[in-house]
C-alpha cells in the first residue's frame, strides 16, 4: 500500500503546492547525511579506510624517488576513495553520485617551501523522489583548494608540514542540469539542484577536506618539498 505522505507529495507536485513538502523531504535527507557524517562514513563501509590507507602508502612510496614523477595512480586511488564515500552517501540519502573523476592534482609553488594545492573532482548526479523516480540528472564539478607549507621552528630548527584551510566556498561547487523529467515544475528541479549543492557541501566540509588534510600531514617534509618543486609563475607540478 502506498504511504499517505507519498500520495500527498505526488498531488502537491502535480498541483504546484509542494514547496513545504519538498522542504520537509530535503531536511530529512540532510539530517540523515549529517548524522552519518558525524558518525564517520567509514563506520558504514570499512573499505573507505582501507582505500585511504593504501592512498597514503602509494603517495609515500612515490616520494622515495629523487623526483616525484607524474602518474595517474594517485588520481585513480583518490577517485576510488571518493567514489566509495559517495556510495555511502547514496545509501544514506538516495542521491546517486557516480562516475567520479579526478583529472589531476596540482601543486603550484608559491615559494620554495609552500604551494597551493588544487584537486578538481567531476561526477554525474541523479536525484529521485518517491513515486516520481528520477527528477533531474546533473553534472557536478568540485574544485577543492588548500595549501601546504614547510615551517621551521626558530629555536629547535625542526621542520614540520603545515596544511592550510580547505575553504568550503559555494563557488567551488558547480552543477549543470543535463536532463530533467518532462512536465515537472521548475520548483521541483530547483529543489533537486539545491539539495545536491547542500549535500555535496556537507561532504566536502566533513569528509573530503579532513581526509585531504590528513593525507598531506602524513607526508614528511622531504616528500612535500619534492611535490612543491621549484616556484615558477606558469608551471604546475602535478602528482
Swiss-Prot record:
Principal subcellular localization: secreted
Tissues in which the protein is found: Detected in salivary tissues: parotid, submandibular and sublingual glands.
Compartments, as annotated in UniProt: Secreted
SUPFAM superfamilies to which the protein is assigned, alphabetical: Bactericidal permeability-increasing protein, BPI (SSF55394)
Disulfide bonds: 166-209
Pfam families the record matches: LBP_BPI_CETP
Residues making up the signal peptide according to the UniProt record: 1-20
The name this protein goes by in its record: Short palate, lung and nasal epithelium carcinoma-associated protein 2A
Organism (species): Bos taurus (Bovine)
